């Protein structure tokens, strides 16, 4: 009987971590994210397990284990971050997993009121701020905002190396950020299409004209295409 009484606080902490983690995960599951209900519940429960075990073995330093949990969640969060073209997806899901671990730590320490308050705030951030972010995205784009662009030039296969270096020099001169440079065979046999991924301010007309006019001076380039990256 005494052993059961000793186990009750342990089980209560784990159940609280699981339920609050599941509450956060339910919102992610509803939005069909990779880390949903079960993942967040397990992350919170696992964090609580580590905290409880550290309090059993070394009750004076649970903070040391909490720091290790934060590091461990970094590896788990990296698994849900995906790069699609120039866009990165999964950052919010990874951040939510990190928060779920924090909820688990609070539950493991028996701070249920703080854990519940944090859960409510996390849910508000994921639900209410999502709506706010969508409204902000509908506002006119600031001239200082960054946009992604795709620059494609076509050249003879033998001139590819020289044209690549030419492009690098022009991009550096235009003070625009180059995030990717590659090439593929062009539709016309014997030619290469060089693709540059650029990042610059939304007010890009002057930069575009500078780059295109400079590229046009190169006789080795047979075609130029510039567009905003829609991904």
Curated annotation (Swiss-Prot):
Task: Name the predominant localization.
Answer: membrane
The subcellular location is: Cell inner membrane
Membrane-topology annotation of the record = Multi-pass membrane protein
Domain of life per record? Bacteria
TM helices/strands, residue ranges: 5-25, 39-59, 62-82, 103-123
Against Pfam families, the record matches this protein to: MgtC, MgtC_SapB_C
A cellular-component GO term for this protein: plasma membrane
Keyword check for Cell membrane: yes
- InterPro entries attached to this UniProt entry: MgtC-like_C (IPR048640), MgtC/SapB/SrpB/YhiD_fam (IPR003416), MgtC_SapB_SrpB_YhiD_N (IPR049177)
User: Keyword annotations for this protein?
Assistant: Cell inner membrane, Cell membrane, Membrane, Transmembrane, Transmembrane helix, Virulence
What does the UniProt function comment say about this protein? Virulence factor required for growth in low Mg(2+) medium and for intramacrophage survival. May be involved in regulating membrane potential by activating Na(+)/K(+)-ATPase.
**Recorded family membership:** Belongs to the MgtC/SapB family.
What name does the UniProt record give this protein?
Protein MgtC
In its UniProt entry, the species of origin is given as Salmonella paratyphi A (strain ATCC 9150 / SARB42)
């Amino acid at each position: 009987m005494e052993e059961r009484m000793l186990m009750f606080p342990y089980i209560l902490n784990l159940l609280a971590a699981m339920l609050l983690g599941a509450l956060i995960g339910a919102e992610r599951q509803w939005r069909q994210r990779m880390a949903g209900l079960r993942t967040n519940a397990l992350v919170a429960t696992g964090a609580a397990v580590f905290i409880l075990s550290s309090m059993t073995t070394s009750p004076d330093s649970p903070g040391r284990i909490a720091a290790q949990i934060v590091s461990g969640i970094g590896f788990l969060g990296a698994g849900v971050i995906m790069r699609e073209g120039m866009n990165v997806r999964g950052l919010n899901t990874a951040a939510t997993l990190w928060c779920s671990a924090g909820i688990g730590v609070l539950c493991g320490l028996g701070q249920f009121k703080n854990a519940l308050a944090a859960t409510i705030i996390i849910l508000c951030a994921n639900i209410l701020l999502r709506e706010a972010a969508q409204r902000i995205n509908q506002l006119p784009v600031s001239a200082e905002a960054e946009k992604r662009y795709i620059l494609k030039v076509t050249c003879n296969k033998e001139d590819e190396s020289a044209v690549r270096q030419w492009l690098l020099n022009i991009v550096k001169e235009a003070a625009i950020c180059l995030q990717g440079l590659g090439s593929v065979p062009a539709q016309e046999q014997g030619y290469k299409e060089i693709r540059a991924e650029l990042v610059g301010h939304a007010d890009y007309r002057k930069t575009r004209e500078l780059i295109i006019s400079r590229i046009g001076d190169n006789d080795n380039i047979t075609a130029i295409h510039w567009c905003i990256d829609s991904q």
